[in-house]
Amino acid sequence: MPVEYYLWLASILFGIGLLGVLTKRNALILMMSVELMLNAANLTFLAFARRSGDVAGHAIAFFVIAVAAAEAAVGLAVVIAIYRSRGAINVDEVRVLSE
């Protein structure tokens, strides 16, 4: 399978994630959109690693996955804490820093 197919898929996934970040106001949807964008970047790293035959792309993708898992855990904990204290997870309704 040509590498260009992987790059097209990665760009489509990144576009869907970017669309979710720009249009949605739900904190969970925003987190999922960011994760989708990170996975698109991982797919790009892996596609170029496959083309060059180097394992550096695989190592970078592995570390991005680890950072994304930590980001998701911390972000979900923050969203749950905000929901428990405010009763909403809409980013327009919740202004934590202003109060």
Swiss-Prot record:
Top-level class of the enzyme under EC nomenclature: translocase
Catalytic activity: a quinone + NADH + 5 H(+)(in) = a quinol + NAD(+) + 4 H(+)(out)
Localisation per UniProt entry: Cell inner membrane
Disulfide bonds: none
Transmembrane stretches, start-end: 2-22, 28-48, 60-80
Name this polypeptide is given: NADH-quinone oxidoreductase subunit K
Position of the signal peptide: none
Subunit architecture: NDH-1 is composed of 14 different subunits. Subunits NuoA, H, J, K, L, M, N constitute the membrane sector of the complex.
Keyword Lyase in record: no
Protein function: NDH-1 shuttles electrons from NADH, via FMN and iron-sulfur (Fe-S) centers, to quinones in the respiratory chain. The immediate electron acceptor for the enzyme in this species is believed to be ubiquinone. Couples the redox reaction to proton translocation (for every two electrons transferred, four hydrogen ions are translocated across the cytoplasmic membrane), and thus conserves the redox energy in a proton gradient.
HAMAP family, per the entry: NDH1_NuoK (MF_01456)
EC number from the UniProt entry: 7.1.1.-
One example GO MF annotation: quinone binding
Organism (species): Anaeromyxobacter dehalogenans (strain 2CP-C)
